[in-house]
Amino acid sequence: MFGRTYYCGEITEKAIGETVKLKGWVQKRRDLGGLIFIDLRDRSGIVQVVFNPDVSKEALAAAEAIRNEYVLDIEGTVSAREEGTVNPNLKTGKIEIKAEAVTVLSTAKTPPFPISDQAADVSEDVRLKHRYLDLRRPAMFQTLQMRHQVTKSIRHFLDENGFLDIETPILTKSSPEGARDYLVPSRVHEGEFYALPQSPQIFKQLLMVSGFERYYQVARCFRDEDLRADRQPEFTQIDIEMSFMSQEDIMALAEEMMAKVMLETKGVEVPLPLPRMTYEEAMNSYGSDKPDTRFGMLLTDVSDIVKDTEFKVFSSAVANGGVVKAINVKGAAGDYSRKDIDALGVFAGNYGAKGLAWVKVEADGVKGPIAKFFDEEKQAKLAEALEASEGDLLLFGADKFEVVAQSLGALRLKLGKERGLIDESLFNFLWVVDWPLLEHDEEEGRFYAAHHPFTMPVREDLDLIETAPEDMKAQAYDLVLNGYELGGGSIRIFEKDVQEKMFGLLGFTKEEAEEEFGYLLEAFEYGAPPHGGIALGLDRLVMLLAGRTNLRDTIAFPKTASASCLLTEAPGEVSDAQLEELHLSVKRKVKQ
């Protein structure tokens, strides 16, 4: 009886009178004394099965012992439900199956939690410990089904556009740039280690040098970094690289691909071309390099208005090269007490802010701790700059630009969510362009690559390498959706001398650069084409399209926030024999 004629959730009234064979799990069992009803579930949905002695006494007797999550093989006839028993909440709610035969394929213990999307109070640890049960829930199946549909759509688009799906190594060489590597000891080469790839970056560039011209890969990547809700130690990215393409060409292709994905998976038409915003504009107006444009409450620079005020926090910040910015929380003056605003200040402090100044706009002017520092003229200018009116709450940050932008940007997002300003039905894509090539770490006194060391500077800025590297712009572009970075790309360096200069800016000696990246530098000596690409985070994209709140829900078997697998209990200890084979010994920390 291993053949099946229908999936449970796909039987309609058209099948009334047919004899069908079904397979699935028992979602629910109800004994009404003489009749037994079972909701049979498979990946497509649920159908009601009725065990009636008038149809089959043998089937009814077998159903007496059946419990939730048993796996059944059922044969029966499709019938219309009686009037008054139709279930409008089920796709199969107008029909039922009159069971003629049933075979128990597998029994089941009582699950540790209900197999239902309504089981919201179950802890995530319990769900992850029993992930194979958690994945039976319809919402989890639908999320992974969407992941499949997204990947399928992307593969089809890239195939139609002449891209080749090429795999790159998982065991590769550790790189000094980026996050920490996951290291794999070599048994054959004593004391030496492979690294799991943080991305296929160099290999895809080498494929361009090899002449493949258009490459893609659904690539597994690994980073040993501190985790948060939208990160995992192992993740998947849609990796794309092209030769002889400009930044405009790559962005046009990537956004066309995303429009196709949105139409095929969500039925949403995305107008093209996508909007663009410079990095400087994003940081100035949104306090973020991945702005959420679904709502307003933009950051406004009021430095010129308040620079000569007697409020020293403002005047000193401007005098010392910093800024004063503000956000207008429309209509919020009556909703936030002093205690509430103090709590907002504590939140801003998590992002480096030393405090949060504020005033409330009332009919006769502004009120609040710093209101006395604003005369009528300044109040009028602030009201104009912030489009403020009676009932508004104005929040100010004063410090270095980076601190103010980051703290007010985070506060903007928090308040946008709290006040219901974000339309969750929107999918707002945009490109962030004109990135700085380098970031300067003041504590270490050195430069870091804003994206990665292989990003090509804007051609006009190449002369600044020796004189003003901090002013160089990158040929880089990030794709943002609803305040999340979906991915980033750039035109790559393909000339050996430029790449060597870039390594020098990042603190590599010529010998260190040769030792770490000599094979890439040598490849550039054999005729390298101009090339560039983009990498998009598949897990994050699916999270946003499926309306989930963390990446773990988009991955079949994810890791926890501490990078462990509760199902398999990885990572785990290994035997002394295994360590000896690898020429390793474990040095354990002494517990205090």
From Swiss-Prot:
One of its GO terms (molecular function) is transferase activity. Its main location: cytoplasm. ATP binds at residues 223-225, 232, 485, 537-540. Gene3D superfamilies: Bira Bifunctional Protein, Domain 2 (3.30.930.10), GAD-like domain (3.30.1360.30), Nucleic acid-binding proteins (2.40.50.140). Residues 201-204 are annotated as: Aspartate. The record marks 84 as: Important for tRNA non-discrimination. Its EC number is 6.1.1.23. HAMAP family: Asp_tRNA_synth_type1. Aspartyl-tRNA synthetase with relaxed tRNA specificity since it is able to aspartylate not only its cognate tRNA(Asp) but also tRNA(Asn). Reaction proceeds in two steps: L-aspartate is first activated by ATP to form Asp-AMP and then transferred to the acceptor end of tRNA(Asp/Asn). Homodimer. This is Aspartate--tRNA(Asp/Asn) ligase. It comes from Bacillus velezensis (strain DSM 23117 / BGSC 10A6 / LMG 26770 / FZB42). The gene is aspS.
